[in-house]
């Protein structure tokens, strides 16, 4: 049932805000980095026809090796020479968020724990509380918990799963979605 609810929110969303946390951070090995990029590449097919923005609390620039559009990514803790870390790109992100009110917004939080909760975790909770047309999917291997008031709304979902593994499963889900559209 949880998977069906999540698929419905994903399908119905007009806009998607994606937060990337420490579960999607490189450990310096090319094997892990390649796996993360490959997992992130599962997102674009699911985002077809939707406006999206990605905020990453990581500083490894892996998100830019993915097929996600760089203009719609901010990585505030990344290298200062990277434009995605600039104040201008942060302001682009804030303007994008301000345009989500009144729209069906899906907040997809992937692997965000408590390293920097002020960047993604807490703002995503607040946005979900304020925008009644929004829903939150929180995916984390050990910290997927939701505040009680959010969990009771029926618009927030806690998925206890490593975010890389969850993204890898999206390929199967995307195929199922395409088959439903073709039927």
Language model segments and positions:
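Conserved catalytic alpha/beta core of Sir2/sirtuin-type deacylases, generalized to analogous enzyme cores
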Residues: 1-183
């Amino acid at each position: 049932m949880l998977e069906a609810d999540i698929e419905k929110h994903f399908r119905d969303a007009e806009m998607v805000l994606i937060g990337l946390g420490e579960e999607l951070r490189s450990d310096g090995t090319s094997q892990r980095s390649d796996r993360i990029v490959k997992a992130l590449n599962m997102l674009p097919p699911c985002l077809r026809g939707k406006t999206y923005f990605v905020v990453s609390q990581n500083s490894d620039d892996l998100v830019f090796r993915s097929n996600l559009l760089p203009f719609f990514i901010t990585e505030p803790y990344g290298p200062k020479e990277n434009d995605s870390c600039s104040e201008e790109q942060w302001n682009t992100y804030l303007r994008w968020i301000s345009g989500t009110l009144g729209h069906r917004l899906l907040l997809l939080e992937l692997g965000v724990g408590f390293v920097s909760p002020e960047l993604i975790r807490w703002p995503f909770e607040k946005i979900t509380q304020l925008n009644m047309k929004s829903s939150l999917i929180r995916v984390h291997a050990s910290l997927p918990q939701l505040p009680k008031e959010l969990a009771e709304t029926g618009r927030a979902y806690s998925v206890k799963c490593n975010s890389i593994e969850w993204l890898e499963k999206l390929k199967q889900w995307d195929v199922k979605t395409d088959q439903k559209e073709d039927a």
